[in-house]
A protein has these predicted regions:
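N-terminal amphipathic alpha-helix/helix-capping segment at the start of soluble metabolic enzymes
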Residues: 1-20, 89
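Acidic (Asp/Glu)-rich catalytic clusters
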Residues: 11-12, 41, 94-98
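Hydrophobic faces of well-ordered beta-strands that scaffold small-molecule active sites
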Residues: 19-23, 48-50, 103-105
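Active-site beta-loop-alpha junctions enriched in small/polar residues
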Residues: 24-26, 51-55, 108-110
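Short, acidic/polar
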Residues: 29-40, 108-110
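A structural motif
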Residues: 44-45, 101
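Glycine-rich, proline-tolerant flexible connector loops at the mouths of alpha/beta enzymes
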Residues: 46-83
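Active-site beta->alpha loop and helix N-cap motifs at the rims of alpha/beta catalytic domains
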Residues: 69-110
């Protein structure tokens, strides 16, 4: 496989392992996101990834989980709690860039 370059780091079969930390939507504010990014930088992670979605685009308000341990919360309510605003995404992206770590997002729906 041919190597590719991600933010000045070669990635490929003959290159050192490229580590990506999944931070998903595990943060609710900028301070929590900074802590996660700082931890990733401290242990030598190459990139962090979060998730971009809006509850309205992936479920309905009347859609419930089909599992016993989820209680009575709807999928919409749960996903709504996990949304990350565009403003917070920009703050987090700017901070990651300043810290020198690659950041990207996995969009749920386009």
């Amino acid at each position: 496989m041919k190597s590719i370059k991600l933010n000045n780091k070669l990635v490929g079969d003959t290159e050192p392992c490229y580590f990506i930390a999944e931070i998903g939507s595990l943060f609710k504010n900028f301070e929590e996101a900074k802590r996660l990014i700082d931890s990733a930088v401290e242990i030598g992670i190459n990139a962090v990834k979060f998730q971009t979605f809006e509850a309205e685009t992936i479920t309905t308000k009347n859609n419930f989980f089909n599992m016993k341990n989820t209680g009575k919360i709807s999928q919409y309510e749960l996903f709504k709690k996990c949304e990350i605003s565009k403003e917070l995404q920009m703050e987090v992206t700017n901070y990651a860039n300043k810290k020198g770590i690659t950041i990207f997002s996995a969009p749920s729906h386009i």
